[in-house]
UniProtKB/Swiss-Prot annotation:
The modification Phosphothreonine is found at T152, T154, T223. This is AP-1 complex subunit mu-1. InterPro entries: Adaptor_comp_med_subunit, AP2_Mu_C_sf, AP_mu_sigma_su, Clathrin_mu, Clathrin_mu_CS, Longin-like_dom_sf, MHD. The modification N-acetylserine is found at S2. Subunit of clathrin-associated adaptor protein complex 1 that plays a role in protein sorting in the trans-Golgi network (TGN) and endosomes. The AP complexes mediate the recruitment of clathrin to membranes and the recognition of sorting signals within the cytosolic tails of transmembrane cargo molecules. It is found in: Cytoplasmic vesicle, Clathrin-coated vesicle membrane; Golgi apparatus. Residues 168-421 form the MHD domain. GO terms for cellular component: clathrin adaptor complex; clathrin-coated vesicle; clathrin-coated vesicle membrane; Golgi apparatus; synapse. SUPFAM superfamilies: Second domain of Mu2 adaptin subunit (ap50) of ap2 adaptor, SNARE-like. The keyword Transport applies. It comes from Rattus norvegicus (Rat). Gene3D superfamilies: 3.30.450.60, Mu homology domain, subdomain B. Phosphorylation of membrane-bound AP1M1/AP1M2 increases its affinity for sorting signals. The gene is Ap1m1.
């Protein structure tokens, strides 16, 4: 069982718009939602599911709005929450910003969307590209020439319309990897993983089939134990367009892509990652009157690669003042509102080492800090490089008209949650 009704409320709990799907819950029940929420908040016992009598309120907050679903039955809670977040996504794609004003300005479209998104309490069409075939930005049905059913009715490929045409046929594919890293104050790597995704922008005419081949090193977690130099991907998720049966048979990623931008696949690699940018810091406090920092940054990737827009965020005491900086490269900025200094290096080639010194005055005499010190965090982006070693071997584009298309492939490695603790 799913939702009985869905409401959008303002911050005071006033109903802006609602839709009754099953008729088994009194629509006035939502009046109890805000008092219960405030009571639980005061008690410090706030939860995403609230109850009044036999009615359950499942809710999320977005900007200055509450999205609430009610149910009297034994609802599938994860499905309801997934649906509420999907509603936020669809509304945001239609109105750019989902807030009270956009709700008030678009009542007609929202009612139409709510009718398509859910039927009798069960989620139905939640893909915004499909919805845009039924419901235009002005809230009217599409009418181009003679009336015709939407492409999704006649077409087995629901995520792509027929009759798409481009003067120039192109495909852009980005392999993006984010490195999550946590290093102890002693220099030991406590946690390291790679979170990757393959994102595409497709501008192709007709109904093309694409075939993507990755390098032989890449294995997927259900293929068994691989060779020592293989890349075993975990938590692999594909876009709905990928033919999973073919992938399970011969590991070919074959698909008819949606038009425009989408994420083809995502993956995770839980492995020991050599820190791409290594930070060593020496912090000296002198009689509570001043504090000195010596920070060394070293790039530990191949010399032919370069990290761009590197930012090293170094925490400093709240009461520090009178900053003085000296660095071999880049620039240093004190950000007092964040209690940190930011060392910025626009271009950081592989195999290089740079030094930065900072000096602060400490006007107040306080006892030694007993709380843990915040870690140093690093931001960076390395183009033409993947930490995992994943590579696109080929990207074939097959379309019955036989046109030539240009595939463009790009690799980017960037920081995720990248932190190094200090002594």
């Amino acid at each position: 069982m799913s939702a009985s009704a869905v409401y959008v409320l303002d911050l005071k709990g006033k109903v802006l718009i609602c839709r009754n799907y099953r008729g088994d819950v009194d629509m006035s029940e939502v009046e109890h939602f805000m008092p219960i929420l405030m009571e639980k908040e005061e008690e410090g016992m706030l939860s995403p599911i609230l109850a009044h009598g036999g009615v359950r309120f499942m809710w999320i907050k977005h900007n200055n709005l509450y999205l609430v679903a009610t149910s009297k039955k034994n609802a599938c809670v994860s499905l309801v929450f997934s649906f509420l977040y999907k509603v936020v996504q669809v509304f945001s794609e239609y109105f750019k910003e989902l807030e009270e004003e956009s709700i008030r300005d678009n009542f007609v479209i929202i009612y139409e969307l709510l009718d398509e998104l859910m039927d009798f309490g069960y989620p139905q069409t939640t893909d915004s590209k499909i919805l845009q075939e039924y419901i235009t930005q002005e809230g009217h049905k599409l009418e181009t020439g003679a009336p015709r059913p939407p492409a999704t009715v006649t077409n087995a490929v629901s995520w792509r319309s027929e009759g798409i045409k481009y003067r120039k046929n192109e495909v852009f594919l980005d392999v993006i990897e984010a490195v999550n890293l946590l290093v102890s104050a002693n220099g030991n790597v406590l946690r390291s993983e790679i979170v990757g995704s393959i994102k595409m922008r497709v501008f192709l005419s007709g109904m093309p089939e694409l075939r993507l081949g990755l390098n032989d090193k890449v294995l997927f977690d259900n293929t068994g134990r691989g060779k020592s130099k293989s890349v075993e991907l975990e938590d692999v998720k594909f876009h709905q367009c990928v033919r999973l049966s073919r992938f399970e048979n011969d590991r070919t990623i074959s698909f008819i892509p949606p038009d425009g931008e989408f994420e083809l696949m995502s993956y995770r690699l839980n492995t020991h990652v050599k820190p791409l940018i290594w930070i060593e810091s020496v912090i000296e406090k002198h009689s509570h009157s001043r504090i000195e920092y010596m920070v060394k940054a070293k790039s530990q990737f191949k010399r032919r690669s370069t990290a761009n827009n590197v930012e090293i965020h170094i925490p400093v005491p709240n009461d520090a003042d009178s900053p003085k900086f000296k660095t071999t490269v880049g620039s240093v900025k004190w950000v007092p509102e964040n209690s940190e200094i930011v060392w910025s290096i626009k271009s950081f080639p592989g195999g290089k080492e740079y030094l930065m010194r900072a000096h602060f005055g400490l006007p107040s005499v306080e006892a030694e800090d007993k709380e843990g010190k915040p870690p140093i965090s690093v931001k960076f982006e390395i183009p033409y490089f993947t930490t995992s070693g994943i590579q696109v071997r080929y990207l074939k584009i097959i379309e019955k008209s036989g046109y030539q298309a240009l595939p463009w492939v790009r690799y980017i490695t960037q920081n995720g949650d990248y932190q190094l603790r200090t002594q």
